[in-house]
UniProtKB/Swiss-Prot annotation:
Record lineage: Bacteria, Bacillati, Actinomycetota, Actinomycetes, Mycobacteriales
GO cellular component: plasma membrane; proton-transporting ATP synthase complex
Name of encoding gene: atpFH
Cell compartment(s), UniProt: Cell membrane
Alphabetic keyword roster: ATP synthesis, Cell membrane, CF(0), Hydrogen ion transport, Ion transport, Membrane, Multifunctional enzyme, Transmembrane, Transmembrane helix, Transport
Main localisation: membrane
Protein name: ATP synthase subunit b-delta
């Protein structure tokens, strides 16, 4: 019995311990487990719901994708049809363009071929015409007839309004023109009382003064400087030259420095011009004007035909004495050289300062002509003119330009026939060679 009671008490103690300390954690654990199961069930339900929603959305997405696919397919079909239509239209346009371009290219090739044929035929025709013309003008009478025909055409020409200046005035401005005119007027007034020796001395002194002004640039600058009062310049001139030059020369130099010059070099040009006038006046007194003119023009043609000699005479870096010596040597071998013409040439070559010798000599010859109130006509012909033709030409040109004309003839066989005339800056080209050249130039490219 005691064992039973002991066991009962032990059982009661065990039950108490279980109830006191074991049951509460177990109950809490079970309750937590129930909550976990309940939460898992809720999550499962939520997941099932989401799955159902996902299936619905998937189905909707499939439906939308199908609809979009059908839409894209329809649009692609429409685009393909439109592109096909555009390509077809472009192909048609391109075909038309290529066709038109081909036709244009054919036309261009045809025109080019025609042009080439015309050029070839034209050139051949011009060459053949040149041969015929050369054969025709080989006869002197036929060649002379071409000059007569040109003169007949020239007679129909209206009077020219061109103003012809000499080289001395063409390069001057208004102030220098007036000053040069005053100096020339002064020369004409004092030169009438001088004999040949006096004019020679005047020319030499003026040329020496020109050389002095060339070498003494400060003096030239002072004397050529425009001033309202020229008295100081005149006094300086007299102080320097009164005992070195004649009264006539000093009087002319007073006039020169008293006037206004556009540039400093114009004063030297004016002094040189007056020195030339003195020698031309000497030729006039001696009755040698025609001879001097002819020899000046002839020497100008010599320089034109001998460019080496012209270049040596034009080389102003060489001392003037050397160039004048070369000129004297060139003139020595020529018979009948007029002394006045030689003096004019020596004076001109010695005072060159950048100009070409051949042009300076022609300017000098034209000055000699202009002193007689005439103008120079440089005439080129294939052969010498007869006296009748020269007279007729002189009369026609005198009528056209309203002044007596001095004809200077240059023979150039390359002209074939007709004449080429230059008066001042005006050119009248009636040569056969120029007409053949114009025909050649007029051929299509």
């Amino acid at each position: 019995m005691s064992i039973f009671i002991g066991q009962l008490i032990g059982f009661a103690v065990i039950a108490f311990i279980i109830v006191k300390w074991v049951v509460p954690p177990v109950r809490t654990l079970m309750r937590n487990q129930q909550e976990a199961v309940r939460a898992a069930l809720a999550e499962s339900a939520e997941a099932a719901k989401k799955l159902a929603d996902a299936d619905a959305m998937h189905a909707k997405a499939l439906a939308d994708a199908k609809a979009e696919s059908e839409k894209v397919t329809e649009e692609a079909k429409q685009d393909s049809e439109r592109i096909a239509a555009q390509l077809s239209e472009q192909a048609g346009s391109e075909a038309e363009r290529i066709k038109a371009q081909g036709a244009q290219q054919i036309q261009l090739m045809r025109q080019q071929l025609i042009r080439q044929l015309r050029t070839g035929l034209g050139a051949e025709a011009v060459n053949k015409a040149a041969e015929i013309v050369r054969a025709h003008v080989a006869d002197p009478q036929a060649q002379s007839a071409t000059v007569d025909r040109f003169l007949s055409e020239l007679e129909q020409m209206a009077p020219s309004s061109v103003v012809i200046d000499t080289a001395a005035t063409s390069r001057l401005r208004a102030a220098s023109r007036q000053s040069l005119a005053a100096l020339v007027e002064k020369f004409d007034s004092v030169a009438g009382g001088l004999d040949a020796d006096g004019l020679t001395n005047l020319a030499d002194e003026l040329a020496s003064v020109a050389k002095l002004l060339l070498s003494e640039t400060a003096l030239n600058k002072h004397l050529a400087e425009p001033t309202d009062d020229s008295a100081p310049k005149v006094r300086l001139l007299e102080r320097l030259l009164s005992d070195k030059v004649s009264a006539t020369t000093l009087d002319l130099l007073r006039t020169a420095v008293s006037n206004r010059w556009s540039t400093e070099s114009n004063l030297i040009d004016a002094v040189e011009h007056t020195a030339r006038l003195a020698l031309l006046k000497r030729a006039e007194i001696a009755g040698e004007v025609d001879e001097v003119e002819e020899q000046l023009f002839r020497f100008g043609r010599v320089l034109d035909a001998e460019p080496r000699l012209s270049a040596l005479l034009s080389d102003y870096t060489t001392p003037a004495e050397g160039r004048v010596a070369l000129l004297d040597k060139a003139l020595t071998g020529r018979p009948g050289v007029n002394q006045t013409a030689a003096a004019l040439l020596s004076q001109t070559v010695g005072l060159l300062r950048g100009e070409r010798a051949d042009e300076a000599v022609i300017d000098l010859a034209e000055l000699a002509v202009s002193r007689r109130g005439e103008v120079v006509a440089h005439v080129s012909a294939a052969a010498e003119l007869s006296d009748a033709q020269r007279t007729r030409l002189t009369e026609v040109l005198s009528r056209i330009y309203g002044r007596p004309v001095s004809v200077q003839l240059h023979v150039d066989p390359e002209l074939l026939g007709g004449l080429s005339i230059t008066v001042g800056d005006e050119v009248i080209d009636g040569s056969i060679a120029s007409r053949l050249a114009a025909a050649q130039t007029g051929l299509p490219d």
